[in-house]
Amino acid sequence: AARALKTNRTYNLGVLYEDPQHSGLGHEYFSRILESFRAQAEACGYDVTFINRNVGKRRSSYLEHCRYRGVDGVCVVCVNFLDPQVLELVQSELPVVTVDHMFNNRTSIVSDNVKGVQTLVNHVFGMGHRNIAFIHGERTAVTESRCASFYKTCYDLGLQVPDAYVREGAYHDCD
């Protein structure tokens, strides 16, 4: 408490994590990011609080919850980035870091989706495969960049990509 008074910090970081598939902390990709975030935060003397739309039994916005908890900043992971409450939080005075989504004037941690798909297709091609299919997630900016990279890499390798080879699927299915 004395340190918080002296530094004007709470040493509490918020995490906004909502997984549409309800896989919780078992999500293969985001669980690793969150564990790394938690470990680094703790190593720096911070606590981590999950942010949601409830403060006790009262509904609140994400920003209200962050203010209620007095977080020094918030990491936004795996949410609908177009949700008005997420936009309110991102546009607030709080420091915000987003994962796999970019906002102007905010820090983002993003995957190199173009290079990742390019590496994957080149690897499969190098193993002798010539009929390569691609299953992508719901239409988002991340999906668009992955699809564009898939088509471009296949084109560069001289591969034909029939429409039937590209399909939408769930990123993660709990069942």
Label the predicted regions:
Residues 16, 51, 77, 134-135:
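Short hydrophobic segments within beta-strands
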Residues 2-62, 72, 151:
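Amphipathic helical "hinge" segments at domain boundaries
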Residues 26-29, 85, 143-146:
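Residues at alpha-helix caps and immediate loop-helix transition turns in enzyme cores, especially N-
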Residues 33-47, 91-98, 102-175:
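Bacterial carbohydrate/catabolite-sensing allosteric modules
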Residues 59-115:
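Short beta-strand-centered segments that line the small-molecule binding cleft or hinge
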Residues 20, 55, 81, 103, ...:
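Short, glycine/serine-rich, charged loops/turns that create anion-binding
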